[in-house]
Amino acid sequence: LQLVFFDQEEQNLQGSLAFTLDPLNLDHLLGVIVLDMVGYRCDQPGCQAYPRGLPIAPPSDRGDFLAVVGTLEHPNLLNAFKASPLTYTLPVPFKGLLTPDVLRSDHAPFWFYGIDAVLVTDTGNLRNPHYHRPSDRSGTIDPVFFAEAAQTVVDALLALQF
């Protein structure tokens, strides 16, 4: 188990790209769980937007779930999250090439190297009005939702069978 923090995601995924370019980092790597924006919840109707071209129907117009995005080609990690009532799992075909909005985070370089990777997210700018703004501060994080997100990842890790 490695805990890795990637930098410069907003600058064309530079941190995760640099990591994947070193073959030693990928040797014996069984999977990657990327957490990106996991602490914002909104319960008001209409507060949740979705990217175009999703292969399945969105669950609701409320932002009270975690999206877990993975590929159809590598379902192991994605399946580990399905048991959680907090998650909405999104299997994406063709490594996201038909839905480029799902390629905006650090999981994407791993997909292109054929490594099972998932993005766990509150959907960022599709829900959070503070995303990348001066008002994006720790006080906007829902501490209960954030703790539930952390527990969801722990539960998924325990459910994994490699």
Tell where the protein language model's regions lie, with residue ranges.
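Acidic/histidine-rich catalytic neighborhood of metal-dependent amide-processing enzymes
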Residues: 1-73
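Active-site-adjacent substrate-binding region
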Residues: 43-162
